[in-house]
């Protein structure tokens, strides 16, 4: 029997507002524990929540960017549960009347475009953070009350690979809107995954398991891959998949039972009595709609149609707004479009990955990268020299030409000097000269390599090729 995988994702995104969802406390990451709290966050008796209008605006902006309908009327509800990092013993959320519904995003997997539906986007407040030690627990309530949006997909995802693509696209869109930085390492983007299997052709869904502790997109994919195999083995062996919550163990790559899955009835939802329903008229919707910036799909189309980039380059460059903005800035500063694309996808990305830093953590600017690329383009700097100059540019900034001169890496373009290197290579490698005359094209490449080696990579490669051909023709 063959099974079809059915996946739905619940993504929590922290909004980067200055203050919290229902209190004036700061909502910034990284403060001293329990320093960003007040009487509302701590659930003192008699205090009343006040809705953060900026959070509502940004929830609407995210909804619109995800092609959702904005509800004219929505409301807040109490989700009741007890946990040490939840002082009220309930969370203010939206249950049956969310701010946004019926959206979608398009993803690309193996060159094919697929539309993934989005059921809803609702607003809620975040809980605090518990840290469990040996025999005791620590609670930090700085995060308590931070504005969240939860984005719930339709069960349209059919593989872990599609889930990964969906998360990449969703993060990209949200980052472009500016409502969140979506940093998983800081907890501003978190994901729970629901997965079930059913025989191919069956309409009814199978019993799902919910996966938690998915701290990166790779862990989402790995957790789903493991759970896919686990459920398939269970069903093929005549067993039954139970509705439960499981945790992904990063060290073993397996999912582990946490608890039997609760249903919505367990939370005893009821309307929040301290907050009136939220009414959004057309004028408010239009004001928010005007704030939506250019989104990744529009930029990707522009890069292909206006800049002439391959679709793959356009896809990579638009994955993050930071990289896309940097690319556009370098092009505006006069850098060649394709060379800039190649450097950002190649040398720049390699440097960032090797040093485990973000683009904003370096001293690179669109202008100083453009300056280096223009030197490559006009032949002043070879690609080999550029690779030696670039780390200095990224670490300390400055001017690429000045760095090249300070390091003694100025490209040799003097014809008489280059001819000496060329003739020396020809004299030292008579067999390669003979091979070239006999039609072996690789021999010329070898000779070029010898010349570049002798010049320590500083010979102008275009002139080397020209002079080498000229001298070979004489022999």
Curated annotation (Swiss-Prot):
Gene Ontology molecular functions: asparaginyl-tRNA synthase (glutamine-hydrolyzing) activity; ATP binding; glutaminyl-tRNA synthase (glutamine-hydrolyzing) activity
Lineage of producing organism: Bacteria, Bacillati, Bacillota, Bacilli, Bacillales
InterPro entries: Asn/Gln-tRNA_amidoTrfase_suB/E, Asn/Gln-tRNA_Trfase_suB/E_cat, Asn/Gln_amidotransferase, Asn/Gln_tRNA_amidoTrase-B-like, GatB, GatB_C_1, GatB_Yqey_C_2, Gln-tRNA_amidoTrfase_suB_CS
Superkingdom classification of source: Bacteria
Record note on quaternary structure: Heterotrimer of A, B and C subunits.
Function noted in UniProt: Allows the formation of correctly charged Asn-tRNA(Asn) or Gln-tRNA(Gln) through the transamidation of misacylated Asp-tRNA(Asn) or Glu-tRNA(Gln) in organisms which lack either or both of asparaginyl-tRNA or glutaminyl-tRNA synthetases. The reaction takes place in the presence of glutamine and ATP through an activated phospho-Asp-tRNA(Asn) or phospho-Glu-tRNA(Gln).
Organism encoding this protein: Staphylococcus carnosus (strain TM300)
Catalysis performed (reactions): L-glutamyl-tRNA(Gln) + L-glutamine + ATP + H2O = L-glutaminyl-tRNA(Gln) + L-glutamate + ADP + phosphate + H(+); L-aspartyl-tRNA(Asn) + L-glutamine + ATP + H2O = L-asparaginyl-tRNA(Asn) + L-glutamate + ADP + phosphate + 2 H(+)
Gene name tied to this protein: gatB
EC number: 6.3.5.-
Protein's UniProt name: Aspartyl/glutamyl-tRNA(Asn/Gln) amidotransferase subunit B
Keyword tags: ATP-binding, Ligase, Nucleotide-binding, Protein biosynthesis
